Amino acid sequence: VNSSAPERRRQLLRISLQAVVADLSGGSHTAADLPGGAWLVDGATLWVRLDDAPHRALGAAIAIALREEVDRVEVLVGDPDPAPLVARRASQWSLPISVRGLDGRSPFPVEPVGHRAPPTVPDSHLDLVETIVAAGAEPVVAHGVLTAQYRGLEIAKVVDDDGAPRLDVGVGVNDREAFRELHAGEAPEASLARVVEAVSAHRVDGARPHPFNTMSPEGYLAWRLRDDPSALGVGSLVTTPGAVAPVGAVDPGPVMMLGGGRLFACTTGFDLGALPDALDAREVAVVAGVIDDASLTVVVPARNRLPVIDRMASAAAAEVRVVEVP
């Protein structure tokens, strides 16, 4: 039976990790899968091979390290580009974590990369803010990009089209391509208003499951808390960008918020990459001086407060509080 391409990739990662560890420490080990990579334990050391979005997959590695009660973590990253970011995030934990790149089967040291100032949004793009507001959506600027959101879900993005700004409407890449074909020639404001109307029926408390409310649940939680910040004991909340741009418009990731001189991270409770994202954002906020309290508050729905969240929070180098909301 032919295995699928993803399974073949997972198998290659397991074999790669086993070979590297055998070269370095001798002996034979059997690696297992983790989201975005592979892992094995050699004595008191967890070895991890990260592949897909390694800066977020680091969270799964840390969760396994805490479960296995190892003394240290050795992280191997095959792609040299994200490896310095992984090294920076590894330094934000009290658990000793070493990050190395891979040249074939040979590991090499990786230096952490510093935080970079985000690019600015072109003025021509900002001219579309009024269009976004008029359609009933919320304009959001992050990482040099202007997007339109509705109750925490990104429903459009401003892009360059032959040097001119254009509102690319839809939820995710595939939806935007289909929307362009179906509604070619329609005014951007009308297109966006059409999406707002479609999403609004589903993005409400108690609605039956639908892609419009199962995507970006963190965004919806953050929107609810901004609408009523009293649950967090602050007078107001505003969203703030994460330390790095998200992998995709509807991919998991915490929504960061500022309020009362504190930094909050809204997450579902199931996303193991949320804490590495949030701790990286905390570092940016501390350096920028935008918070008075250097701790991080992780906000999760009460029904989703899994023990792993608290274990990971206690393993962070900074103080991390976990709070529940209804």
Model-predicted regions and their roles:
Residues 1-326:
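Charged, terminal alpha-helix-loop-beta segments
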